[in-house]
């Protein structure tokens, strides 16, 4: 993908006309005085970093459970990697870097312990009460569950940050009001009654670069962790033409490189090529669209920050390899089954006896509730757990806790 380097931003450039503007934000649900030293998007990013939910990401994992080793990615390290890539993309495209970084930092807040396995298990037990969606849970955390301020629940982010959180993967509704990926989760609909996030339009370009940064980070670090664990080998990587090309480049330049350095050289190149591909596609689409404001980005009929056809095919090949070699590996499947059992057991135990939650706040809020609202509170409590806390809670309540190693 060809890039026009003359059009790139390098940190000192003014924002493009299509960038989100923190000085003309659509505001916050609760009116606040502005800051003399920080823009509204800077304040959003700072509020996100200071939340309890952000700190909990340190002990939430994605594929490899926390007990597997100290060097595997957690939700926190993944989030930091996504934020770095999102900020680099935003800088190159002359966007608001603080908004892009904020969306990247908050995008995983709603994830449960044990990654997608925990989410699937929690969704299953909550199905009679509306199910569970991590994106909707992220919104609940920043608008309701975080309790840090005297005047409101949540952290009162700007409309643009919340829009990016909810719509970073694209519109949730068609123009006719039909869900683009199934029914829109009720918590999102409820919030839109108060503060319409315009679910039928695309999000800002800042949110779009955060979304594609998530894909880039996932693909890269799951390969890195897969090689570290032994579930992937260099021979497996060479089955994908893009990765085979990167490996050939590294071998040609460093013919006697040790395996760990060889891996990192591949990963560096993978991130760079994918980032450059996205920049090139975005430049092409922006030149065709000729947007004059952030509103023009939202009104566009397609995403702007995305992979080229060739890189999208590479993305599919990498995901297929990871699914086959890691996510469906028998060892990982055994661990996933145990993790799902922990979530299911804890939900049943807390529904039967909320006092087992050992938290006055949650117990006081559940007292006297019917099953549906009680289940939602229990779901909130479980979703906020880290891997390590969920394991210890299960050990306290049950005679046998699955071995997740």
Swiss-Prot record:
GO terms for biological process, alphabetical: dGTP catabolic process
Keywords, ordered alphabetically: Hydrolase
Keyword Hydrolase tagged: yes
Keyword 4Fe-4S: no
Domain HD: 75-219
Pfam families on file: HD, HD_assoc
UniProt xrefs under PROSITE patterns: HD
Highest rank taxon of the organism: Bacteria
Xref: SUPFAM superfamilies: HD-domain/PDEase-like
Alphabetized InterPro entries for the sequence: dGTPase, dGTPase-like, dNTPase_2, HD/PDEase_dom, HD_domain, PHydrolase_assoc_dom
MF annotations from Gene Ontology: dGTPase activity
Family indicated by similarity: Belongs to the dGTPase family. Type 2 subfamily.
Protein name in the entry: Deoxyguanosinetriphosphate triphosphohydrolase-like protein
Organism: Rhizobium johnstonii (strain DSM 114642 / LMG 32736 / 3841) (Rhizobium leguminosarum bv. viciae)
Organism lineage: Bacteria, Pseudomonadati, Pseudomonadota, Alphaproteobacteria, Hyphomicrobiales
């Amino acid at each position: 993908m060809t890039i026009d380097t003359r059009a790139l931003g390098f940190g000192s450039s003014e924002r493009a006309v299509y960038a989100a503007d923190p000085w003309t934000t659509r505001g916050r649900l609760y009116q606040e005085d502005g800051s003399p030293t920080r823009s509204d998007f800077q304040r959003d990013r700072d509020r996100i970093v200071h939340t309890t939910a952000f700190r909990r990401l340190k002990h939430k994992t994605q594929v490899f459970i926390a007990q597997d080793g100290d060097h595997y990615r957690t939700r926190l390290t993944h989030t930091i990697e996504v934020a770095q890539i999102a900020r680099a993309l935003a800088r190159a495209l002359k966007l608001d870097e603080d908004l892009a970084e904020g969306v990247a930092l908050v995008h995983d807040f709603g994830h449960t312990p044990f990654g997608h396995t925990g989410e699937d298990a929690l969704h299953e037990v909550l199905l009679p009460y509306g199910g569970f969606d991590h994106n909707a849970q992220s919104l609940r955390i920043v608008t309701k569950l975080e309790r840090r301020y005297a005047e409101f629940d949540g952290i009162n982010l700007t409309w643009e940050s919340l829009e990016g959180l909810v719509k970073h993967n694209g519109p949730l509704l068609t123009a006719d009001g039909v869900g683009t990926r199934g029914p829109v989760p009720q918590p999102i609909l409820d919030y839109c009654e108060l503060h319409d996030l315009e679910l039928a339009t695309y999000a800002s370009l800042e949110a779009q670069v955060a979304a594609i940064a998530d894909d880039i980070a996932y693909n890269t670090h799951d390969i890195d962790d897969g090689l570290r664990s032994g579930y992937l080998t260099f021979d497996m990587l060479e089955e994908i033409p893009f990765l085979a090309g990167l490996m050939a480049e590294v071998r040609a330049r460093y013919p006697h490189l040790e395996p760990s350095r060889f891996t990192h050289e591949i990963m560096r190149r993978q991130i760079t090529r994918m980032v450059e591909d996205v920049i090139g596609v975005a430049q092409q689409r922006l030149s065709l669209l000729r947007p004059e404001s952030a509103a023009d980005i939202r009104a566009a009929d397609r995403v702007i920050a995305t992979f080229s056809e060739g890189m999208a095919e590479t993305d599919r090949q990498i995901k297929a390899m990871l699914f086959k070699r890691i996510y469906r590996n028998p060892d990982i499947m055994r661990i996933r089954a145990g993790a799902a059992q922990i979530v299911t057991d804890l939900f049943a135990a807390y529904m039967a006896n909320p006092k087992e939650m050992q938290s006055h706040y949650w117990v006081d809020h559940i007292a006297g509730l019917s099953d549906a609202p009680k289940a939602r509170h229990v779901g909130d409590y479980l979703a906020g757990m880290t891997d390590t806390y969920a394991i210890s809670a299960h050990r306290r309540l049950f005679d046998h806790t699955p071995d997740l190693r």
